[in-house]
Regions:
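Long, low-complexity segments enriched in small/aliphatic residues
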Residues: 1-87
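Long, contiguous, secondary-structure-rich segments that constitute the structural scaffold
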Residues: 1-15, 78, 82-98, 102-177
Length: 177
């Protein structure tokens, strides 16, 4: 990536860190971007409030949980490059679904067991992980594992403005695999 051209492995190893973006190979990088202004006619940021658009699909009796998808630290995006890194795979070797510990106990599951996460679009088998950072009533799946394609489970309904699918909110259920 051109934006990383001035941040080499050698530089990271010798300096410990480099602020991004770095405009030259020996420059410190920009700690604060847009310090001298934003790329607008006034130089000020343009902040536009939006109206809240409710999700297209809400939890119900059949699918009482909310599935949200996202990234994980060890595998970037789809894992196309990071899944080949032995060190990263050693830290996160398999697809997981994270759930609040109270939900795990309330629903009779145990940490580490194989579960099936299902939405109206399909189902995927994963290992269950307890995570207090996941809101009760929600499931979190990273989308980087090809063997457990999280975004195949999400609602394809597009946001009316951004034209982005609802990757962050899909009605779901979980059961023993």
């Amino acid at each position: 990536m051109r934006s990383l051209d001035n941040i080499s492995w050698e530089r990271l190893e010798s300096e410990g860190f480099v602020c991004y973006p770095a405009k030259s190979q020996d420059g410190p990088g920009e700690e604060i971007i847009f310090y001298s202004g934003f790329p607008t006619p006034t130089g000020r940021a343009k902040i536009v409030p939006t109206e809240l658009v409710p999700p297209d699909e809400l939890p119900d009796e059949d699918f009482p949980l909310v599935l949200t998808t996202g990234r994980m630290l060890e595998h970037w995006h789809t894992g196309a490059m990071t899944s080949r890194a032995k060190a990263l795979n050693a830290q996160e070797p398999e697809a997981v679904v994270s759930m609040h510990p109270k939900d795990i106990g309330r629903m009779g599951f145990t940490r580490g067991q194989k579960v099936m996460v299902e939405t109206r679009r399909g189902e995927v088998t994963l290992t269950l992980r307890a995570d207090r950072d996941v809101t009760p009533g929600m499931l979190f799946m990273p989308f980087c594992f090809t063997e457990a394609p999280a975004n195949f489970l999400t609602n394809p309904q597009l946001d009316p403005y951004g034209k982005i699918p609802e990757f962050k909110f899909s009605a779901a259920r979980i059961r023993q695999a």
